[in-house]
Amino acid sequence: MNDLFSFPKNEVIKTNEKLGFKKSKTIEKANLRQSIRDCNFEATMNDLGGFPKSNQYFAIKTNGTSDCGSIFTYALNNWEEITEMYLATWTISKQNISRLKLAVESGKLKNLTMVFSSTLKGANPALYASLVGALKNFKNVKLKEINSHAKTFSISNGIDFLTVSGSANWSENPRIENFLLLNDKDLFEHHKDWMSELTDLV
């Protein structure tokens, strides 16, 4: 098991602070925080030689200095495109909603299937509205709101078939989380099948 991040505690970016800034300052700080988290993950992947090769995996844990969105961004930056993505999460941050939307708009993310918890609407109506409003009108995006607590996503560029599973949602978690990064086509197809089946339900 590799320690993904081993920074001193005073360098950990806390993501649950109550900010007293105007909205523009809040967004600016959130973007900076996310950029730092992305750099943390990129540095670790560089040390490991990039994503796992075919039929290999990395078992890693974090101390709260990165998240699923950082893994997704690393793929965007290192692959020519993501041809397919199958994503299941219980919740998601506004920054990561924006990442997905921008990736679809730019053409870097060709097809997205997303399964998310039916509790989101009641628990956080504003976040629910942001998620659905950002993605529902794209023809190459399928959304399914259902009773789910799954936390996994699978992406492919047509050559590699990466699945990321673990304890973390697509939110910014300032705590220890565990991840498995597996490059396995059969596992990719497994997640593709069950998420596609759910999104095809009325």
Task: Give residue spans per PLM region.
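Cysteine/selenocysteine-centered motifs that mediate thiol-based redox chemistry or coordinate metal-sulfur cofactors
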Residues: H190-V202
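HKD (HxKxxxxD) catalytic microenvironment of the phospholipase D
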Residues: F5-F7, M85, N140-K192
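Short, surface-exposed linear patches
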Residues: G107-L112, L135-F138, R175-E177, K185-F188, ...
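Short, flexible loop segments at the rims of nucleotide/cofactor-binding pockets, characterized by
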Residues: A59-T65, T89-I92, V141-K142
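N-terminal localization/anchoring segments of enzymes in phospholipid and broader phosphate metabolism
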Residues: M1-I82, E105-S106, L120, F161, ...
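Primarily the HKD phosphodiesterase
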Residues: G69-K136
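Short beta->alpha linker loops
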Residues: S66-D67, T91, N147, D186
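Conserved beta-strand termini and adjacent loop/short-helix elements that scaffold enzyme active sites
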Residues: T62-N63, V115-S117, L143-I146
